[in-house]
Amino acid sequence: NSARGFDTVNEKYQECQTKMEEAEKTASEAEQEIQSLNRRIQLLEEDMERSEERLQTATEKLEEASKAADESERNRKVLENLNNASEERTDVLEKQLTEAKLIAEEADKKYDEAARKLAITEVDLERAEARLEAAEAKVLELEEELKVVGNNMKSLEISEQEASQREDSYEETIRDLTQRLKDAENRATEAERTVSKLQKEVDRLEDELLAEKERYKAISDELDQTFAELAGY
């Protein structure tokens, strides 16, 4: 009986020893698995930290990119507005250039017309001056003739009948010469009025020509400025 009891106890001991070894093995495996899991957790935490850092970096870069995009959009709108303003300014300058060209062409026409009128008036003035000189010479000639007749009347000693007859003749001659003198004086006066009128017309045309020249110069200066502004764009 004692031997049988010992065997039973020994079997139980062996069984317990086996179970203990299995338990220790299981515990050791569990510890190893725990350590492995801890390492995996640590790696995952480190990877998460790196992921969070990358996420933070990506978020910051995204914010910077968003700000850059906003700034780029603002710059684009500014450039677009500047471009629109430049196009509008160019259109205005082109219209001003067209108007200035038309004004310059009109000024050229007026300048040519004024120069032509001035040339014609100068010719008329020369002719009038020539007529005035001729009329004045004729007046002097008639005055000399009248003086000669008067002197001859005083120096002649003739009979009363002859004197009377010649007096009538002389009176007729004097009347004729007086009338011719009056006509010549009238023509001279008319010629003087014509010359004065033509001189006023010449003065007016010269003033008009000067004004057209000044206006033409102003238009030319404006054209030069417009071309310079267009060249700047």
UniProtKB/Swiss-Prot annotation:
Biological role: Tropomyosin, in association with the troponin complex, plays a central role in the calcium dependent regulation of muscle contraction.
Region (Disordered): 48-88
Intrachain S-S bonds: none
Organism: Magallana gigas (Pacific oyster)
Family statement drawn from the similarity comment of this UniProt entry: Belongs to the tropomyosin family.
PROSITE patterns documented for this protein: TROPOMYOSIN
Keywords: Allergen, Coiled coil, Muscle protein, Repeat
Gene Ontology MF terms: protein homodimerization activity
InterPro entries in the cross-refs: Tropomyosin
Protein name per its UniProtKB record: Tropomyosin
Gene3D superfamilies hit by this protein: 1.20.5.170
Upper classification of the organism: Eukaryota, Metazoa, Spiralia, Lophotrochozoa, Mollusca
Coiled-coil boundaries: 6-222
Superkingdom of origin organism: Eukaryota
Self-association and partners: Homodimer.
